[in-house]
UniProtKB/Swiss-Prot annotation:
Induction: Induced by glutamate, via the alternate sigma factor 54. Keywords: Hydrolase, Periplasm, Signal. Residues 1-25 form the signal peptide. It catalyses: L-glutamine + H2O = L-glutamate + NH4(+); L-asparagine + H2O = L-aspartate + NH4(+). GO terms for biological process: asparagine metabolic process. It is an enzyme of class 3 (hydrolase). GO terms for molecular function: asparaginase activity; glutamin-(asparagin-)ase activity; glutaminase activity. This is Glutaminase-asparaginase. The keyword Hydrolase applies. Homotetramer. It comes from the Bacteria. InterPro entries: AsnASE_II (IPR004550), Asp/glu_Ase-like_sf (IPR036152), Asparaginase/glutaminase-like (IPR006034), Asparaginase/glutaminase_AS1 (IPR020827), Asparaginase/glutaminase_AS2 (IPR027475), Asparaginase_C (IPR040919), L-asparaginase_C (IPR027473), L-asparaginase_N (IPR027474). GO terms for cellular component: periplasmic space.
Length: 362
């Protein structure tokens, strides 16, 4: 009996010692199978904090760092190998062209890395749609790039940031998100970075596209219903690596009793192009038309867009004789997205016909 015990005890100890090794090996195998996703943090409401849980609309944005954001969603480790970088920490209404270029260059560096399968960018919602469209134009990669934010700070009751971030990482790590351009995941929907806009500022269901979402995320799985129709990323003629700076493009708003004061002031301040955010079909007041005609003769590009809330659709030579005036129409791009494309396009050409082609294709 003693002999049997002597044999059993060392054997049992050996098995017990093997259990941690086997568990570690399984953990390593699991991590190897998971996608490698980098989260670039820029600030915004998703990194915001309020004074109490009841503060869903009054809070301070850009307070929480990326490591704290990741730690707040421990389930991320089950769907991807995640690491974070704090690229900047600002409210998105303060993002400028230099910030766009800085972010775009870092995204390109990561996209070139064999160790990165997908990229998530946490962003304030005020200009999220602009950043998403900019990246959609200039990033030469088919790897998933997801821009995500939240409508409520993490300190609020029923905060939406945790699930939005989880969904963003899930989409960024999925192979079926490759080649679909830059995406935005908010409120369980997958939107095209080109199409999506913030439609309301106090609801979690805030981001909508005039042509509908590309898909949905349910319990971390992506379901797709349509593909982007316009050129983007790998098919784009623009490349962040060749863009040194962005020209000044400004927006002038159209409304009843408008004067030409704004457009003249913007041109005098150095605008290379003016997006006219017109009513309806990009309409321009008769008080403003002569000033825009004169500015075009001086070399300023004039681009007609519409500030219709649900999405404008500006037809060329309707409302205004664009061919005669040598103006450009923004197609279905809202004024803020038209500004993004105009800035990027002007790094390639000053020809209005080429600009119009780009507005049709992108």
């Amino acid at each position: 009996m003693k002999s049997a015990l002597k044999t059993f005890v060392p054997g049992a100890l050996a098995l017990l010692l093997l259990f941690p090794v086997a568990a570690q090996a399984k953990e390593v195998e699991t991590k190897t199978k998971l996608a490698n996703v980098v989260i670039l943090a820029t600030g915004g409401t998703i990194a915001g904090a309020g004074a109490s849980a009841a503060n869903s609309a009054t809070y301070q944005a850009a307070k929480v760092g990326i490591e704290q954001l990741i730690a707040g969603v421990p389930e991320l480790s089950q769907i991807a190998n995640v690491r974070g970088e704090q690229v900047m920490q600002i409210a998105s209404e303060s993002i400028n062209n230099e910030n766009l270029l800085q972010l775009g260059r870092r995204v390109a560096e990561l996209a070139d890395s064999k160790d990165v399968d997908g990229i998530v960018i946490t962003h304030g919602t005020d200009t999220l749609e602009e950043t998403a469209y900019f990246l959609n134009l200039v990033e030469k990669t088919d790897k998933p790039i997801i821009v995500v934010g939240s409508m409520r700070p993490g300190t609020a009751m029923s905060a939406d940031g945790m699930l939005n971030l989880y969904n963003a990482v899930a989409v960024a790590g999925s192979k079926d998100a490759r080649g679909k351009g830059v995406l935005v995941t908010m409120n369980d929907e997958i939107q095209s970075g080109r199409d999506v806009s913030k439609m309301i500022n106090i609801k979690t269901e805030a981001f909508k596209s005039p042509w509908g979402p590309l898909g949905m995320v349910v319990e971390g799985k992506s379901y797709w219903f349509r593909l982007p129709a316009k050129r983007h990323t790998m098919d784009s003629e623009f490349d962040i690596k060749t863009i040194k700076s962005l020209p000044d493009v400004e927006i002038a708003y159209g409304y009843g009793n408008v004067s030409d004061t704004a457009v003249k002031a913007l041109a005098q301040a150095g605008a290379k192009a003016i997006i006219h955010a017109g009513t309806g079909n990009g309409s321009v007041s008769s008080k403003v038309v002569p000033a825009l005609q004169e500015l075009r003769k001086q070399g300023v590009q004039i681009i007609r867009s519409s500030h219709v809330n649900a999405g404008g659709f500006v037809l060329r030579n309707a409302e205004q004789p664009d061919d005669k005036y040598d103006w450009v129409v923004a197609h279905d791009l809202n004024p803020q997205k038209a500004r993004i494309l105009a800035m990027v396009a002007l790094t390639k050409t000053q020809d209005s016909k080429e600009l119009q082609r780009m507005f049709w294709e992108y």
